[in-house]
Amino acid sequence: MDPRSEVLLRQAELFQGPLLIAGAPADDLLGQLPQAQAWTWHAGDQAMLDSRFAGRSHYAVEPPDLPFDSAVLFLPKSRELAAYLLNALASRLAGRELYLVGEKRGGIEGAAKQLQAFGKPRKLDSARHCQLWQVTIDQAPQAKPLESLAERFELALEDGPLQVVSLPGVFSHGRLDRGTALLLKHLDGLPDGHMLDFGCGAGVLGATLKRRYPQSRVTMLDVDAFAVAASRLTLAANGLEGDVISGDGIDAAPTELSLILSNPPFHTGVHTNYQASENLLKKSAVHLRKGGEMRLVANSFLRYQPLIEGALGNCQVRDEADGFRIYQATHG
């Protein structure tokens, strides 16, 4: 079980009425707290929770429209996302209890200061390198619309400016990361057809593809509900259309693709996790049509080339700069 869940269960007597667990991990916490419902924005966690606790987990960027007497937030990595989530929960809990649980190395002590906006926070427990905090909502805030927290910026690209809309918690929130910047220079000569932006984030790559290859169908896939929402906003901001879907890894992607384009993720919360990226490489042949291409950017220290060669039989390094490599391979 997640150590944060274990700390929460040490205080299980506090949770007598309907409880909302925001950012719930995919463990047995709902089994131990039968009065609880989960709110998650991670498609993989949602699938696992729903398979075990059908109807008790809700995947969205806003709290589910359910009655609850108290709520627990599992602290996310992003401080901006934590602020949005705390505000969204506190707006529904006037005079009631809001709890915050997280790892010490994830910044729980600093994040607990954000509770001061709603009342007087106090630390209830500390164990397993985690802490549990509580605040009674004396001053319930107005819920902030998610779009009001969006960061909007413009990229000067070869074929004109691209408007980008980023949301809290999305990778490289509010700015263009170096890996994607390098990959944007290598979008020439791509095979038309059905293109996939894997791990789409704020939708920079997918929107650029759709504008540069308007006759192609573009699908954008991400595990994170906030990234899915941001990508849809980015498409709309540029007058573009595309399919933006949520799913946990390449297994959720269509088949018969002409292209897989990606700056693949390798973080889950504060932890490093290469599984989604390695599965993408190993299973790429299942999702590409014959003659289809995979083009991606990755940190130079990651040994992705042997995995790509093992899956597709070939791989070339198109470019290397700023600690990143561009890989290209074709499904023969």
UniProtKB/Swiss-Prot annotation:
Keywords: Cytoplasm, Methyltransferase, rRNA processing, S-adenosyl-L-methionine, Transferase
Main location: cytoplasm
Keyword rRNA processing attached: yes
Name of the gene this protein is made from: rsmC
Family of the protein in this entry: Belongs to the methyltransferase superfamily. RsmC family.
E.C. no: 2.1.1.172
Subunit-level organization: Monomer.
Protein name, UniProt field: Ribosomal RNA small subunit methyltransferase C
GO terms under cellular component: cytoplasm
Subcellular localization(s) per the UniProt record: Cytoplasm
Enzyme class, UniProt record, top EC level: transferase
A Pfam family reported for this protein in Swiss-Prot or TrEMBL: MTS_N
Reaction(s) catalysed (UniProt annotation): guanosine(1207) in 16S rRNA + S-adenosyl-L-methionine = N(2)-methylguanosine(1207) in 16S rRNA + S-adenosyl-L-homocysteine + H(+)
Record-linked InterPro entries: DNA_methylase_N6_adenine_CS, Mtase_sm_N, rRNA_ssu_MeTfrase_C, RsmC/RlmG, SAM-dependent_MTases_sf, Small_mtfrase_dom
Gene Ontology molecular function, alphabetical: 16S rRNA (guanine(1207)-N(2))-methyltransferase activity; nucleic acid binding
